């Protein structure tokens, strides 16, 4: 596996079929913001057969220091913890080599899900642990 910069077409094709798709992770959304003050990068983790296994877009600005935003989180199978861990490792290396000083991310997965009787139905704390391992720090969670 390796992390590469995807073309707009590669990213668009992947983002349209992914189950975690959201408007923040679309080419159209980045085109709106690119004209403002941001540059866009489409990053993907590919296997040996060039299949995209995970991807994200990074909006970056370079006003003295290089900062990035990952809106809507990654387009990845969050239930595959090994894949998420590998993606985070490679992404952190990419960000360091690309001289990013700060990157904020607002993932759209739920931390914990409860029913109306306050019984825990879904616990995604392991995802948070993986993100924390690579110094992605959460500021708030959605519990539903």
Predicted features by range, described:
Residues 1-29:
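Short amphipathic alpha-helix that is part of the acyltransferase structural core
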Residues 7-9, 26, 30, 56, ...:
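Residue-identity detector for threonine
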Residues 14-18, 91-95, 131:
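Hydrophobic, Leu/Ile/Phe/Ala-enriched alpha-helical segments that form helix-helix packing faces
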Residues 1-6, 53, 127-144:
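Acyltransferase donor/substrate-recognition loop-hinge adjacent to the catalytic core
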Residues 120-127:
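Alpha-helical transmembrane segments in multi-pass membrane proteins
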Residues 4-8, 88, 124:
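A structural signal for well-ordered alpha-helical scaffolds and beta->alpha junctions
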Residues 20-24, 101, 137:
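A general structural signal for well-ordered secondary-structure junctions
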Residues 32-120:
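Conserved donor-binding loop and adjoining core beta-sheet/short helix segment
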